[in-house]
A protein has these predicted regions:
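Canonical Rossmann dinucleotide-binding motif of NAD(H)/NADP(H)-dependent dehydrogenases/reductases
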Residues: 1-17
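Substrate-binding pocket helix/loop in short-chain dehydrogenase/reductase
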Residues: 81-82, 89-91, 190
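Active-site helix of classical SDR
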Residues: 105, 142, 150
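Alpha-helical segment proximal to the catalytic Tyr-Lys
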Residues: 110, 155-156, 218
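Residue(s) in the substrate-gating loop at a strand-loop-helix junction
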Residues: 125
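Short C-terminal tail/terminal secondary-structure segment
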Residues: 130, 208-210, 221-234
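Short, small/polar-rich loop/turn modules that mediate ligand/substrate recognition or access, typified
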Residues: 158, 163, 220-222
Length: 234
């Protein structure tokens, strides 16, 4: 999903810094954007590392002059029952999905303040809004944490011109959902819970992220944008 966001932003004229622990994949997307006439740089980014976040923000400022938008997109998933979930499994998901968003937000705010404001878009999930029996407790908890962290950020920094909003995708065709989509029974179960009857596409989420990052959303902060094919309307 992050690649779709980066490509769309670049198409709209944004200068992008892409961060990921998957260096080959990240560099390939940055190179693709550059080859098409866009401006992009890649930095290795472990979202659980304060040092990596400091490096990423510094690169954005040094390379492009300022930081105006942060999209916290990194995430990992899991499927388990409460009693089968180990503390290590809980920590792994919470560290990436929740702590990673906190660290990214914390690192970006000073640069956005210097730039005169900015927009933070945090990717949560429809499972950060409603419960379900087909995921893990740590995944839902982490995505719920992202939702409320976003609201606190929005309230604390509204007067400084820094907006923060969360995006709540339903099941999307991405590498993270590939294994579950490949299992026929699981795929059919998930599809049955989507009123539109299909998985979403990464580009459909990317356009929502673009809106929240843009000046067209200048009066939008502390809000949730749900892109889930109707899952949470039930």
């Amino acid at each position: 999903m992050g690649a779709a966001v980066a490509r769309l932003f670049a198409h709209e004229g944004a200068r992008a810094v892409l961060g990921d622990v998957l260096e080959d994949e990240g560099r390939a997307v940055a190179a693709e954007i550059t080859a098409k006439g866009g401006e992009a740089a890649f930095v290795r980014l472990d979202v659980t590392s304060e040092t990596d976040w400091a490096r990423a923000v510094a690169l954005a400022v040094e390379r492009f002059g300022a930081l105006h938008v942060l999209v916290n997109n990194a995430g990992v998933s899991a499927a388990s029952r409460v009693e089968d979930t180990t503390p290590a499994e809980w920590d792994r998901v919470m560290d990436v999905n929740a702590k990673g968003v906190f660290l990214g937000t914390r690192a970006a705010i000073p640069a956005m303040r210097t730039a005169g404001g900015g927009s933070i878009v945090n990717i949560s999930s429809q499972l950060g809004l409603v419960g379900t029996d087909i995921t893990s407790p740590q995944y839902s908890a982490s995505k719920g944490a992202v939702r409320l962290l976003t609201k606190v950020t929005a309230l604390q920094y509204a007067k400084e011109g820094i907006r923060a909003n969360s995006v709540h995708p339903g099941p999307i065709v991405t590498p993270m959902t590939e294994k579950r989509r490949a299992d026929r029974a699981t795929s059919e179960l998930m599809r049955s819970r989507i009123p539109m009857g299909r998985f979403g596409e990464a580009d459909e989420v990317a356009y929502g992220v673009l809106y929240l990052a843009s000046d067209e959303a200048s009066f939008v902060t502390g809000s949730e944008l749900v892109i889930d094919g109707g899952w949470t309307a039930q």
